[in-house]
Amino acid sequence: MRTSPMPAKFRSVRVVVITGSVTAAPVRVSETLRRLIDVSVLAENSGREPADERRGDFSAHTEPYRRELLAHCYRMTGSLHDAEDLVQETLLRAWKAYEGFAGKSSLRTWLHRIATNTCLTALEGRRRRPLPTGLGRPSADPSGELVERREVSWLEPLPDVTDDPADPSTIVGNRESVRLAFVAALQHLSPRQRAVLLLRDVLQWKSAEVADAIGTSTVAVNSLLQRARSQLQTVRPSAADRLSAPDSPEAQDLLARYIAAFEAYDIDRLVELFTAEAIWEMPPYTGWYQGAQAIVTLIHQQCPAYSPGDMRLISLIANGQPAAAMYMRAGDVHLPFQLHVLDMAADRVSHVVAFLDTTLFPKFGLPDSL
């Protein structure tokens, strides 16, 4: 195909190039959608339609909302991996529909509407993502055999999405709304209950707006919301169990002592750091353990560390909570081992979820080895 000579005046506009076909399942979507690339296209200054102009600005207009869209999709799915793919699919759908966006709602609202329906489609027929504490009673013997179930789609942690002061979202970026215990509680709701609760109580939408977004009536929305709130009260953290700021001096001091105890392999010091009723769980293992002594027995008996220096940890924030990435000695280096997300009560650790999925480490910007 021959083209006419290129005009003298050009400018660069950003568009999206799609390669391959798109499938519905997020785990397969990523292979295609991650090939979305920004390219520079030369176009004449004159003769461009307003819709083309707006499409050219799509990336600049939508990029500020990527973080909160990720948080929203994560709350809906309980999976960081799926949330990333669903954000990509949301932006793909939005780009295709951008020409028809009339501005009757804000761009932020419009994007969340698309994201919500994208998540609802992806969640059809899927099981909830649990933590071990959601499967039964605590394990009695921390020295016993550990039961691993990698076929289960476990809840995943989320990197901090509130560290950018330029983020336009102050509601969605609230750390309480991505707290691990809250996201785990959301998994007990149906996808539509989850969507209604998040749109009403986190994003502060009106019932009529929610009804319009998910294609139902206001009466149905209010009914779904009532059932969701009622069910959530039985599984969510209590109102008194407030999340302390992970970057507060108190939280940072306790996290530093927690890291120091592990790196020194100081079991006695670890016992002192946990509350009497502290909980330890580590997906993909199904067991969970309660009580400081049970936890340190588990660490002493089951952890592949034997002496000071076998473990190294990096402090970070996950789900708006203090967290630490643990690396285990492997010859002359330390390799990714676990990602710990902590709950703290006063000056003690009350709950640890230790994720053994090392594919999470790059998502948190962590090094391959130490």
From Swiss-Prot:
Inducing or repressing factors = Very poorly expressed in exponential phase; further repressed at room temperature. Up-regulated 10-fold 7 days after infection of human macrophages. Induced by DNA-damaging agents but not by surface stress (detergent).
Q: Which residues bind DNA?
A: 207-226
Q: Does the keyword Cell wall biogenesis/degradation apply?
A: no
The keyword DNA-binding is annotated on this UniProt entry: yes
Chain intervals for the UniProt region annotation (Sigma-70 factor domain-4): 180-232
State what the entry records as the consequence of deleting this gene. Not essential, no effect on the SOS response genes, no change in resistance to DNA-damaging agents including mitomycin C.
Provide the residue span(s) of the region labelled Sigma-70 factor domain-2.
63-129
One Gene Ontology term of the biological-process aspect is: regulation of DNA-templated transcription
Q: What's the superkingdom here?
A: Bacteria
The record's GO CC annotations read: plasma membrane
Instruction: List the ranges annotated as motif Polymerase core binding.
Output: 85-88
* GO MF: DNA binding; sigma factor activity
Q: Which CDD domains does the entry link to?
A: Sigma70_r4 (cd06171)
Q: Which UniProt keywords apply?
A: DNA-binding, Sigma factor, Transcription, Transcription regulation
Family stated for the protein in its record: Belongs to the sigma-70 factor family. ECF subfamily.
Q: State whether it acts alone or in a complex, and with which partners, per the record.
A: Interacts transiently with the RNA polymerase catalytic core formed by RpoA, RpoB, RpoC and RpoZ (2 alpha, 1 beta, 1 beta' and 1 omega subunit) to form the RNA polymerase holoenzyme that can initiate transcription.
Q: What does this protein do?
A: Sigma factors are initiation factors that promote the attachment of RNA polymerase to specific initiation sites and are then released. Extracytoplasmic function (ECF) sigma factors are held in an inactive form by a cognate anti-sigma factor until released, although no anti-sigma factor is known for this protein. May be involved in host intracellular survival after infection (strains H37Rv and CDC 1551). A role in the SOS response is controversial; it has been seen in strain CDC 1551 but not in H37Rv.
How does the entry describe the domains? The sigma-70 factor domain-2 mediates sequence-specific interaction with the -10 element in promoter DNA, and plays an important role in melting the double-stranded DNA and the formation of the transcription bubble. The sigma-70 factor domain 2 mediates interaction with the RNA polymerase subunits RpoB and RpoC.
| Protein known as | ECF RNA polymerase sigma factor SigG
